C-alpha cells in the first residue's frame, strides 16, 4: 500500500517502512506523528483513492528517526561592471521519518 502525503508544502509518495526526509518537524527522536493530509492512497494491484483535495479518513503514522541538516547551498548575486556582489549560504533543517502504517477507514 502507498500514499501521497503533504508535509511542509511538498508532496511525498510513501510506502510502509520507507524512510523519507521532510522539512523540520519539531519532536523528540522516537516520537510518533500522524499525517492527516493524504492526497492519494492506493495499492499497486487495485484502484487508488484520489482526494478532492484530501482523502477523508486516511492517516499515515510515522516515527521520527533523525533530526539533521541538508548540504549547504550557496546563493550568489552579481551585477557586472558595478562591483556589486552578494554571497549567502543556507542549510535546510530536515527531519528523517520512518513510515510505520498507512490506514483508511
From Swiss-Prot:
Gene Ontology BP terms: translation
InterPro entries: bL21-like, bL21-like_sf, Ribosomal_bL21, Ribosomal_bL21_CS
A cellular component term, taken from the record's GO annotations: ribosome
Pfam families: Ribosomal_L21p
Top-level taxonomic group: Bacteria
GO MF terms held by the record: rRNA binding; structural constituent of ribosome
PROSITE patterns xrefs: RIBOSOMAL_L21
Similarity section: Belongs to the bacterial ribosomal protein bL21 family.
Role according to the record: This protein binds to 23S rRNA in the presence of protein L20.
Protein name: Large ribosomal subunit protein bL21
Species per Swiss-Prot/TrEMBL record: Rickettsia akari (strain Hartford)
Biological classification of the source: Bacteria, Pseudomonadati, Pseudomonadota, Alphaproteobacteria, Rickettsiales
Gene that encodes it: rplU
